[in-house]
């Protein structure tokens, strides 16, 4: 009879940012193990709290089903000699399976007849299997760095304290990670019973919540935090900033969530909200509260891990903790504004960007020139772009950014505004880091875009130029920077060429670079980011590969090609023309020699080749405007009309004719046909 199954691993505090992924991987790995072991079940639910990982399997089979295993032996023609006696091959096979040749069955198919051994194998009870399945599931967790504890060589993400494995009300005995299975479960450190025994898997997780004051259901904890935080914010007339990453982290930090509201002095609101929010969210894991106009309120919401009889004391304690940090931010803000940003420019010479690439001042000089160069091409104000480039990194020398590093850029904007800098120049200091992550907002102006691209391109070309292209790790975030440049160009429709931009960045870096192939390497790298981007957007790999084969270096143009090929692929003629292009490519690849530049009309003999030649000539002229303007969708839609003459050509014309002149003429025709498509993409790479 199927029973519910429970495994709980009690540990020391698990890394909060990894808790969900650990639990999900544990469940996935364990379920895969059950499938491999052929153990049926109705479902698996994972549980995770700061000091435990658990799985509950509903209706787990009591064991494997009995089955018959068939082992095929040698063919009858090999198993017996001409006199019908068993050969050594047959005898050896039979002996290996513990039978005689006479006891073997026969397997007959339309392909022949073989000796066959049928063995009945009894299924193992689940108790003999689950400990090994669990151990393998835990061994397969995504643990970046395991640790040892005590005198043991056993490694896990954190020291393991308890293990409970129950099948119904039966304790499954065994050890995992050096800990023996027992009925003891640990509760909350400060509430409920710190240790108690569990009698049955069916009691979990309710017994843990009732007696141990631990809410093991991760999603339930998260739901409580979200609901109560929204109510708490509403109570003070605001809206809580419930960023999912922070909510997830807080959920992973508490076993018994209690949402409370605290406040801070109104005077701190004179400090830019970003600095206050940084310390609230980053340092303290608090949720800021805003009004309807997105102005920060002097309140914050936090989640306590204990249900106190005196919540006021808990609130006051948290207010006392955050107050000095906010006071620091206020002090830094007031102190930093006593000097204009531009006065800090020389100090950038004291900060190293990268040993071979120089100081941040060196980088600033390069950004300034490159931003002006880009601005000219995208019709942005050149002088303002250069001014923004010059000021871009000055806030790194301020006390605020030194203490609260994530405020770089935004504090530059505030300080520049205070200094009386142009509004768009100040904004560019903030937006230079955009986009900061996948899906993030792009810079909102041409000036900001020019500075953002200049900063990223200088880093990309510089790091590639000294031979430090990212492999496994990416310490300079070049993948993100590359995608950022591509997004800015594509989504704004800028007519920029990567070859030109990379060449200019290389020129500004000068003799600091040692990689002679830096331009080609960077283009390959950035085009590779295109592949990931379009795959995420839902475009199939073959469409992307078809465009990549042409190596277009204008990102906006690349985008038009991908969308055009995607549209073309849906046309009725697409599959046949893709196959024809592949056939043409194969034929041309086999020809070793030079082809005439033009078709000799006098050598056209068959009606089908005359028709195709005429169509190719007409199409070549008709498509010139579309190619010139990058209207690739229109071009491919027209090229789809070539399906019938192409099919007729291959049905009626022998390309590789005995007559050399005739053969070359036909190959030239096919080459011209293929070149029409290659002006957009290599559609021969499209799959069915």
Swiss-Prot record:
Q: Where in the cell is it found?
A: Cytoplasm
InterPro entries (UniProt xref): DALR_anticod-bd, Gly-tRNA-synth_bsu, Gly-tRNA-synth_heterodimer
SUPFAM superfamilies registered for this protein in UniProt: HD-domain/PDEase-like
Instruction: Give any GO molecular function from the UniProt entry.
Output: glycine-tRNA ligase activity
Could you give a single Gene Ontology term from the biological process aspect?
glycyl-tRNA aminoacylation
Per its record, the protein catalyses: tRNA(Gly) + glycine + ATP = glycyl-tRNA(Gly) + AMP + diphosphate
Q: Does the keyword Protein biosynthesis apply?
A: yes
Could you confirm whether the keyword Protein biosynthesis appears in this record? yes
Q: Give the EC number.
A: 6.1.1.14
| An example Gene Ontology CC term for this record | cytosol
Say which domain of life the source belongs to.
Bacteria
Keyword set, alphabetical order: Aminoacyl-tRNA synthetase, ATP-binding, Cytoplasm, Ligase, Nucleotide-binding, Protein biosynthesis
Where is this chain primarily localised? cytoplasm
In this record, what's one Pfam family? tRNA_synt_2f
Q: Which family does it belong to?
A: Belongs to the class-II aminoacyl-tRNA synthetase family.
Q: What is its quaternary makeup? A: Tetramer of two alpha and two beta subunits.
PANTHER family, from UniProt?
GLYCINE--TRNA LIGASE, CHLOROPLASTIC_MITOCHONDRIAL 2, GLYCYL-TRNA SYNTHETASE
Name this protein carries in UniProt: Glycine--tRNA ligase beta subunit
Q: Which organism is it from?
A: Vibrio atlanticus (strain LGP32)
For this protein's source organism, the top of the classification is: Bacteria, Pseudomonadati, Pseudomonadota, Gammaproteobacteria, Vibrionales
